[in-house]
Amino acid sequence: MSADTHESHDHHGDHHHVLPWWKKYLFSTDHKTIGIQYGLAAGAFLLFGFFLMIVMRWSIAYPHEPLPGYMSWIFTDGWKARWLVDGKVTGETYNMFGAMHGTIMVFLGVVPLGFAAFGNYVTPLQIGAPDMAFPKLNMASFWVYLAGGLVMCMSFFMESGAAKSGWTNYSPLAGYADSQIVNQFLAGQTQWLIGLVLLITSSLLGSVNFITTIIQLRAKGLTWMRLPFFVWAMLVTGFLLLLAFPPLEAAGIMQLMDRVTGSSFFMPSGLFSSADGVAMDLSGSGSPLLFQHLFWFLGHPEVYVLLLPAIACVAEIIPCNTRKPLWGYKSMVYAVIALGFLSFIVWAHHMYLTGMGPVISTFFQTTTVLISVPSVILLTSLIISLWGGSIRFTMPMIWAAAFLPMFGIGGLTGLPLAFNLADLHLHDTYYVIGHFHYVVAPGILFGLFAGVYHWYPKMTGRYMDNFLGHLHFWPSLICMNFLFFPMLTQGMAGFHRRWYNGGEGYIEKASDGVNVFGITVAEKISLNEVMTASAIALAIFQVPFLVNMAVSYWRGKKVTSDNPWDATTLEWATPTPPGHGNFTFEPSIYRGPYEYSRPDHDTDFFPQWEEPKRDEPAEKPAESPEEETTKA
């Protein structure tokens, strides 16, 4: 496509009335703008959550040293007096930062970035829809999410500080924390619960919208087995959110009532104050165990809410850059559906230490092992898709390729935790932290970074810079492994995840003869300094990415085609960037999503929307989505 054609595409949709800036960019109902809003907001929350982690890691590595100036500047004089002692992080501050780090990174960062940002921008384009099914509901979903996030983060400015009961918010601690505050609505723990309810409400609005959009707004000829895998992943993720989040929302409301109205849904009898040993004035008879069940019923499907968008991005990038079809497409579709189903019957493997009997623990051990099967199918299909391909090592492809082994490490290190005998020793140690972070950080975030580099040209009409991309990728890969792998070895040595001083008291009592991988338990405390240095370096090497995002928007190399990657899915048939209504023609789909290197075609890609030539063999006509849905 010529530059002149590209420029005219930039003005696609000008025949529609011009909206005021606040309606076009702030309170927009356009799925693309909302996707970008989600991405920017989630990115800001991720940076804040990352900062909290840096402070925590300093406390772990150097518990007797004050925070350096580049960390302590954010603390006002009042905050320093309240949350630091001689400039050092206290145990209370560590608990607060730990609770908010987990909450922010999961609920405010990765989930909205993967599902809401990428899903909002890409899904309607890939199915040939002009927008989401409910545009105003889509806008409401974003603003409810932002309100929930701000409520949670503003709790840092409360007299009590933010929540300190861990990101899981277990009762009875979470039900009684900050109880000295007269107005409980001004307590950080209460603000956390209010924010949680808002975030879940936002997710429910979004999930209904995604499910309806994918079922009802597919283009002509886009049958179920012609959907890109990305869309399948968004559909399954939507159902996970729709079915798993309501129990946690109910739990959040009940815990809120425990704090504000004096009820005892989760508060047991017989609790005594640790300060003075006096019995607490509670009605009692509640069940803390019930809250754990409600939380983890969401908590494990939530892992796949985090994971599936990243796998979806990688599944789009690998075929495009190997120039061959996605291996085992149907197997991957069935696997992701099975993964969604099984994720609802494994939650109690987080609760082996709560005293469940052998029968029920055997059931959850079995289902936990079973759920690894569809995960292995997905990962294996992506790896085999590389075999025999003409691989183009673009920046998206490099990130996608790195995702595969990193996610593999995260998955394999989770297998021992499926068995209660192993979990008895590893539960709440740094092994669990290392396993989870291998899945979320070098796993999921690498997949999402790949997605940013892949779709950035479509969003902006410009490429991201390759040099800055490599400067971002290679140090990030190295730093993440130096940050998270030592956690696995520390965990096997018994290091607990909640020690704000890095485990000084533990190693004093540890036997010098005990070692893991040839390193004694006492020597393993030095790994804290390695991990902290890696975390700080990792933060520094995210700067090239931020610079790349900003500078490329204004000065990046312009794309010369609406389909710069020579891809086959429908989003590349739109103008660049897509205008109002997305398409300049009514899209029809004639084939599957990954038709690369077909011997009967003159180029190495055969887009879904390209009509067959007269001399080509006619393909079996597809039913319209409406007819297919009616038959189903």
Regions found by a protein language model. Give the residues of each.
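Membrane-embedded and interfacial regions of multi-pass energy-transducing membrane proteins
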Residues: 2-632
